[in-house]
Amino acid sequence: MSGYTVKPPTGDTNEQTQFIDYFNLFYSKRGQEQISISQQLGNYGTTFFSASRQSYWNTSRSDQQISFGLNVPFGDITTSLNYSYSNNIWQNDRDHLLAFTLNVPFSHWMRTDSQSAFRNSNASYSMSNDLKGGMTNLSGVYGTLLPDNNLNYSVQVGNTHGGNTSSGTSGYSSLNYRGAYGNTNVGYSRSGDSSQIYYGMSGGIIAHADGITFGQPLGDTMVLVKAPGADNVKIENQTGIHTDWRGYAILPFATEYRENRVALNANSLADNVELDETVVTVIPTHGAIARATFNAQIGGKVLMTLKYGNKSVPFGAIVTHGENKNGSIVAENGQVYLTGLPQSGQLQVSWGKDKNSNCIVEYKLPEVSPGTLLNQQTAICR
């Protein structure tokens, strides 16, 4: 509960006040009382009640608003019944409104593991009555589409009849797409004899040392993802955002002076791409563009069994190739997992400092079909 009361310094309630009121310059606001109550009804829903009163100088009249309602779920189906009353000082009539709404998700009729394109869609219906003979009915469907749920759609039709309002039908539809290179929207509405079409595009651009990257509309603080070679890789927890053809992406919003976790979805990597790490943490300052850099290994993936003489290469040996100086560790039986390999080349193997603890592998990867994720072969280390 909250409120306030203002008294003039003289104590004279009939004193003419300053002309500051928004609807009548003579009646400026004097005091306000508010009350709001809500109650959870266990598994049966919630109920609420709210009321307010606004008083003014130079009049005994006041604004009054009262509303109460009940929200009841039936599993994943939600319903609500609300009543509202308002009486404003500048109106001679009192307004009443009784409203009912129903929302049913399409998933109510689907299996929990359904992959239907409409699993994130809903059907809705609402009815309102002004208790003076006027009634409005609205029904529609809305939801999200595409694997990343980055296409929002809404379709709604309605009709109004009776009371003091003009009768007629209305309709509305819209599409909103959030993409890696920007956002687009288009919509159409019709009410009575008038109709309207609207459309729009928005986005952001960052120019940096490596070129230009397009993205969604930019905030004050943001992150530039740099993963050269890892193209079209989804950014986790970012709707519609993935790396471009060069491996760059923009995260348009970031929390300043806090750790921001930037993660690439490893499941969206190409078959010949492997990341040294899939998560990078950045801490941007206010208004900064922080860079999250990922190192991508591009090339073949091989599970190779290494032989040295008549034995397997020792457990724990380090295998390096090309510019990959971090190396891979040999497991039992001389097996080592290698990524980013060119079609042919050399591998350096080391398990000690003397010359008998080092050897070279000459390898050539076989031609495989695009769907093959992992090559397996045995190689001799000399």
Swiss-Prot record:
Q: Which GO terms describe its cellular component?
A: cell outer membrane
Against InterPro entries, the record matches this protein to: Fimb_usher, FimD_plug_dom, PapC-like_C, PapC-like_C_sf
Top-level taxon: Bacteria
Q: Which GO terms describe its molecular function?
A: fimbrial usher porin activity
An example GO biological process term is: pilus assembly
Pfam families membership? PapC_C, Usher
Q: Could you say what a knockout of this gene produces?
A: Increased biofilm formation.
Which PANTHER family does the record associate with it? FIMBRIAL USHER DOMAIN-CONTAINING PROTEIN YDET-RELATED, OUTER MEMBRANE USHER PROTEIN
What protein is this chain from?
Fimbrial usher domain-containing protein YdeT
Species this protein is from: Escherichia coli (strain K12)
